[in-house]
Amino acid sequence: MDNKIVYVVSDSVGETADLVVRAAMGQFPFAPDIRRVPYVEDTGTLKEVISIAKSNQALICFTLVKPDMRQYLVTEAAKEGVEAYDIIGPLIDQIEEITGQVPRYEPGVVRRLDEEYFKKIEAIEFAVKYDDGRDARGILKADIVLIGVSRTSKTPLSQYLAHNKRLKVANVPLVPEVDPPEELYQVAKEKCFGLKITPDKLNHIRKERLKSLGLSDGATYANINRIQEEIDHFEEVISRINCQVIDVSNKAIEETANIIVNAVQNQKMF
């Protein structure tokens, strides 16, 4: 039984069938020769695979979601004396019977879910890498650029958009003593969102932040005059960029995120 040939047939990439076959074959002392046949869309290809499998005395394992394709392969393989094992079909049928729901019969669903997962991870890593203006190069690479003074929820909003919307977000803090990066004036204004907050609200947030750190709430960081200076600087920069401004004074992260996503969708940027 050394090098037993197994043809893995799929209407998508064939990763699911490949993994199952390797897991099963791992229980035996012989090494299988697994040959993947992906993206099968017609019975002609199935007929050809059956013929080759017969000549090689091979086994066929398949994941075909469409019932007519599954039935064709099983029937024709049996006629030729070729063993064909349906990996996913019986489970789909059983789930349909139990739930009463009709399957979509749509190939490649698992792969698309995997792709969405990796997009999410990529977006989260992007948000971490380009958080708080760490690297201005991220501004030109980002889907969204958040701009605001300290404590306007730039970081949690970046993470929320990355995790839930798979958007790559860079955020840029503004302070009067530091010139904004030039990239901020080069990126499309439609990608930029200024996060505005009232002085009183920001004063309260910063005082609470200082208390949580065991520091005096009388520090310059929470001084109302300093806060107003920062907000004035923010408005000057935003006026130059001419981007959309969102008042986050009394908004939850989810609310602000929805405003941004709706704006992006309306612009048909993605």
From Swiss-Prot:
Its EC number is 2.7.11.32, 2.7.4.27. Signal peptide: none annotated. It is an enzyme of class 2 (transferase). ADP binds at residues 148-155. Keywords: Kinase, Nucleotide-binding, Serine/threonine-protein kinase, Transferase. It holds the Pfam family Kinase-PPPase. Belongs to the pyruvate, phosphate/water dikinase regulatory protein family. PDRP subfamily. PANTHER family: PYRUVATE, PHOSPHATE DIKINASE REGULATORY PROTEIN 1, CHLOROPLASTIC. Bifunctional serine/threonine kinase and phosphorylase involved in the regulation of the pyruvate, phosphate dikinase (PPDK) by catalyzing its phosphorylation/dephosphorylation. This is Putative pyruvate, phosphate dikinase regulatory protein.
